[in-house]
Amino acid sequence: MTESFEIFDVVIVGGGPSGATAATDLALLGSKVCLLDRAGRIKPCGGAIPPKLIEEFAIPDSLLVARVNSARMISPSQTAVDMPIEGGFVGMVDREHFDEWLRQRAQAAGADLRLGTFERVTRAADGTAIVHYRPAANASRESTSPTSRQMRARAIIGADGAMSAVAKQCIAGADRIRYVAAYHEIVRVPSGATQQFAATRCDVYYQGRLSPDFYAWVFPHGDTASVGVGSAHKGFSLRRAVEELRKLSDLAGVETIRR
């Protein structure tokens, strides 16, 4: 007896902004789409979206937690340059709520949203991809079912991040792609502007002590702010860099909401 599988035109692994948006667009075009998203940490991200992208991707005002109208660039020599933002402002979003809204939009467009963890891809005799995954045990995604499931896909989109498990299985050399690791903390901001922090300004630091090869950021989110750094150097302490960054930006003593 031949085992039967659900067949999708496209299976998208990863329900972040790229995966969820692809699911929405493909579903609206009439494709049968499955969006597979797993439980996991919220990725470190400043959450900035330029006005042109807010319009192009129809992001509602209700998702914007702040509007930033300037950016400050701090050089290795401590020179700070303030620049106005083209288009008037950059919208700031909280990725925890923004990503979930994008997934719900994809589902409303007709995509089949499934909670679970991607395991592997195999091929049927006719070459069709078989996606193996482990469903979440409950809606809170706190654990996965012990039983693996399968579905067929005419195409697979690996939107599961820089260290994509899909890419590693399907694309030669994907495991050697360089990537930047990032770490951020969401903190409560002071009630008013301080000497180094302003609620309507993004700060970007290009300083070796904060990141030897990337940059550090302080992005306001209304009552909170994302304070983070990135680096490709595996021996570099991102947590210590964020601790230093909080001191520099007058955010050392405020409440830490999320790490």
Each predicted region: which residue ranges?
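Glycine-rich FAD pyrophosphate-binding loop
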Residues: V11, T24-C45
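Beta1/beta-strand and adjacent pyrophosphate-binding region of the FAD-binding site
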Residues: T2-G16
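Oxyanion-binding "anion nests"
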Residues: R258-R259
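Predominantly flavin-linked oxidoreductase catalytic cores and closely associated redox partners
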Residues: L29, R105-E255
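Cofactor-binding loop segments of dinucleotide-utilizing enzymes, especially the Rossmann-like FAD-
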Residues: G15, R38, A232
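N-terminal Rossmann-fold NAD(P) dinucleotide-binding loop
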Residues: G19-A20
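Short amphipathic alpha-helical segments
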Residues: A23-D25, G47-A48, K168-I171
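A conserved beta-strand/loop capping segment in the N-terminal third of enzymes
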Residues: K52-R105, L115-G116, R123
